[in-house]
Amino acid sequence: MNTGISPKQDDASNSNLLNIGQDHSLQYQGLEHNDSQYRDASHQTPHQYLNQFQAQPQQQQQQQQQQQQQQQQAPYQGHFQQSPQQQQQNVYYPLPPQSLTQPTSQSQQQQQQQQQQQYANSNSNSNNNVNVNALPQDFGYMQQTGSGQNYPTINQQQFSEFYNSFLSHLTQKQTNPSVTGTGASSNNNSNNNNVSSGNNSTSSNPAQLAASQLNPATAAAAAANNAAGPASYLSQLPQVQRYYPNNMNALSSLLDPSSAGNAAGNANTATHPGLLPPNLQPQLTHHQQQMQQQLQLQQQQQLQQQQQLQQQHQLQQQQQLQQQHHHLQQQQQQQQHPVVKKLSSTQSRIERRKQLKKQGPKRPSSAYFLFSMSIRNELLQQFPEAKVPELSKLASARWKELTDDQKKPFYEEFRTNWEKYRVVRDAYEKTLPPKRPSGPFIQFTQEIRPTVVKENPDKGLIEITKIIGERWRELDPAKKAEYTETYKKRLKEWESCYPDENDPNGNPTGHSHKAMNMNLNMDTKIMENQDSIEHITANAIDSVTGSNSNSTNPNTPVSPPISLQQQPLQQQQQQQQQQQHMLLADPTTNGSIIKNE
């Protein structure tokens, strides 16, 4: 098909020369231009062509309003003649896609197909007179040219198709360098002479096959461009990237700086930095530097926090170790130097008397212990491997087998030893400080208890104690005062036996007065409370009976008296150890016995 135009003037009519299907979902900015821009496209470079498009976004709103008004006034505009200056240029106006014009009946579809066929035939038969037939409503706005004639302009969808064809044409010319000047006119003449051959060759051309997927007008424009030949008016073409992710085109990003900024900010887009506007490149690099600095600061802060936490943890561990070490040292010091609990004056006197009494003569061993020690050597000869528990069991078994006559000599020996012990004990206790005197109520109980027991022989200890408490409450206050005075005198005598705790003048300290007052108050409280009388009275009675039993035993052995003042404590302990060794070696020897039955 011979169009009669030069390759310099076919960039507005070529829709898609790379055999790529048209994507109608792409949205482009509605840029409107005069026809003179498309006629004079051969005298412009690609950069000038882009600069012209960058100046148009300000007029978009006004042109859209004009387009709406013209669509309402004239549904179709057609059969316009070109000026003599435009007869050498064949302008194609492809029909919009079916998504824009949706016919409601089959008759409208048939009319549209007939109009498209007439349009293609008119373009192929004549190069001088070009008539555009049956232009749809979407293309119904007109622009005034320099010659005064009205020509249809291009809407947004048509411009997107022309734009794709322009980029495709640039990429094709880049691979196939073309000739300029007279070479372009010679190619035009050869194309005019070979119209039929060009039409026949489009069926086998891949561009024609790709154009079949588009609308008929776009396919016709692609076939005309293939017939025109590879000649082009461009000698050096820029590197242009055709497609980009997320349906973003390189030229649209270059035309609108705001869209380029959005594309650079989107993580899913990958626009090359060379295609961005010059003013955005330093901004992006500065932003990246700021982000890197922020990341470095965050990392430094995290490292500092980790170091601080580690230091705190180490300090805590050191403090714990120091506390443990200090605690161990305190325990060792306590073990080496045990802390002696400070006792009151009364308690210290009682404890001192107990310790002194333990250092005195020991009680004699019983008849059973004397028998077991007498047969110990015999048992060791019979059972040399037997231990002490086994020997004691054998001795007890033999003791049970003895009759009373056989046990009598052992009991007589015990009586003689007891008489000796009693004499020595009494002499030793005279050297000891006296016992702490009992309170007034305990003195009254010790005196009245034998009479109460004779009067009530059938009653028990608790009932007898209650009777004594009732008599104490009924007692005359004058007699109670006498018991109190006797208690005070005995207490002073008891305190005088501990001169180291008195004042330098020999007067008792304040602790003794406190102890005396506590005993008096305790006696009065005991008399007021009947329940506490029973326990205290029973203990007092037991102490009295125990002292009487010791004093009334006639068979106590007599031994030479021993005084603590003559022998120090260490010598007495050594003597006790020697006596124990002697008993183990010879059980028949006389002396103090450690263990009682």
From Swiss-Prot:
Residues 32-42 have a biased composition (Basic and acidic residues). It comes from Saccharomyces cerevisiae (strain ATCC 204508 / S288c). Residues 52-134, 178-212, 260-271, 281-291, 327-337, 543-556, 564-580 have a biased composition (Low complexity). The keyword Cell cycle does not apply. Residues 361-429, 434-502 bind DNA. Residues 351-361 have a biased composition (Basic residues). This is Intrastrand cross-link recognition protein. One of its GO terms (biological process) is regulation of ribosome biogenesis. GO terms for molecular function: core promoter sequence-specific DNA binding; damaged DNA binding; sequence-specific DNA binding. It is found in: Nucleus. The gene is IXR1. Binds to platinated DNA and confers sensitivity to the anticancer drug cisplatin. Activate the expression of the COX5B gene. The modification Phosphoserine is found at residue 532. Residues 1-28, 587-597 have a biased composition (Polar residues). Disulfide bonds: none annotated. Residues 1-134, 174-212, 259-291, 327-364, 543-597 are annotated as: Disordered. Keywords: Activator, DNA-binding, Nucleus, Phosphoprotein, Repeat, Transcription, Transcription regulation. One of its GO terms (cellular component) is chromatin. Its main location: nucleus.
